[in-house]
């Protein structure tokens, strides 16, 4: 269902098996719920619906995917290489019963994903050692395989199509519902999947929004508005592009917005120039903060984050936020989003610019084709 080859899925399973060994466990429970839980789809090929629990057994042929709703089981069986069974009333109870049926339960079991507390208690009540494998799993997602990069390129193309359609829909009288509908259709008509589409709308002359909103509210776009966006469409679960842009509606940017965007472009260029293997996250943070701070502005959104398989390291926070910059070194094959969200210090006006980039030995490679820069529409 995810479109990856058998060889790619086996590569992932072997890599995860090595993480089990490092964690001192022979098996693991990989959990996802409510369309979230990237490890389930990464290892099984099944996009999580209501709930899914993957039993990663000592031998790959013994892996079992437990799916919560009985009517979801048939498609899961058609889509996955692993055995699929109904999860029953409680997925962890079913998993422990299956493991016990093969002999006695192991003394230690690894866990990946946000396992609910009640199910954790069930597990901890029968297994003496419950091992958190989330950090190890995250490390497996940082450097992308050739097939993963290809999927991200496809996600980038779908995202470009969405932003192109969005830009065409931004005109006076259009609601944010209608604009986002146009963006969604552009990628769903090509088989793309939803990921995120955030939109910020405010008047350039009296700004009150500095970062895109996560939910549309029926806001009507007007002449001389400024629109910021953060759009991601996916080729497979967690394989999305990401484009952040700013548009002015029916008029050129005011002096303030022109300055904000010029600073954002300069910050983007400074960070992108440093995207080479061996660069530390602290160096990326310093490059962005120097440009933004010297201009007298700040930011709200994270400046940089890993992407493709989750919201990954390095997550570099906006200037002034009480969050330490991680001690992290870039490696070729990582994919990151550079996204300086430059805003005024009063938080009333802001711009977005940025996109998903591939770290290579030669420097950053663009995966997107949508033009950079502040654009006028409508």
Each PLM stretch: what is its role?
Residues 1-378:
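Active-site neighborhoods and metal-handling regions in enzymes and metal-associated proteins
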